[in-house]
């Protein structure tokens, strides 16, 4: 699998988790409660580790600098926009984690706050993934050489083993499969 295909495949996993988050949000709307704080914590771990450290790490450390080297602008361009959205995602995950903590401390309004931030995160990621899949990644395929992409893939493997940890990727996929069976079937 080449570097860009790896990022596209990771987007599929992210889309599944945001569908699961939508279902959890629907349950919050119906009951005012979080049906499983454990499942929410698992999703937050996925968002922080897989989405941010792994996936965004690959983009920020390798893809974006490579695009800048071939003249794709950071300021006012797609790279800058993606970086800004990555930060917005981090901020929203922090807000969701804070709301979960407040919920666990007995705050009756915290579930709805979590749902509000989850909705914002879902919208952000849906739009972000569309931009990357349909604009940024085609730019990368067009402008980056096969050698650059091959080197990038090796770098991706290093990020995965060093920032995420051996076996963690597979562990996340098992978690997603389990939550998918609970929430989406």
Where are these regions (language model features)?
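Small-residue-biased structural context
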Residues: 1-185
């Amino acid at each position: 699998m080449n570097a860009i295909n790896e990022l596209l495949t990771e987007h599929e996993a992210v889309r599944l988790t945001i569908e699961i988050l939508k279902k959890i949000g629907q349950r919050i709307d119906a009951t005012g409660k979080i049906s499983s704080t454990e499942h929410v914590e698992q999703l937050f771990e996925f968002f922080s580790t897989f989405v941010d450290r792994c996936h965004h790490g690959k983009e920020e450390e390798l893809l974006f600098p490579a695009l800048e080297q071939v003249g794709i602008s950071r300021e006012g361009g797609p790279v800058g926009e993606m970086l800004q959205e990555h930060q917005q995602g981090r901020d929203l995950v922090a807000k969701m984690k804070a709301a979960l903590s407040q919920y666990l401390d007995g705050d009756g309004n915290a579930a709805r706050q979590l749902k509000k931030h989850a909705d914002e995160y879902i919208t952000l990621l849906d739009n972000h993934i569309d931009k990357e899949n349909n604009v940024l990644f085609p730019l990368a395929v067009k402008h980056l050489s096969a050698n650059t992409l091959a080197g990038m893939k090796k770098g991706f493997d290093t990020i995965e083993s060093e920032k995420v940890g051996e076996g963690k990727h597979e562990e996340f996929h098992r978690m997603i499969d389990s939550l998918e069976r609970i929430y989406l079937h």
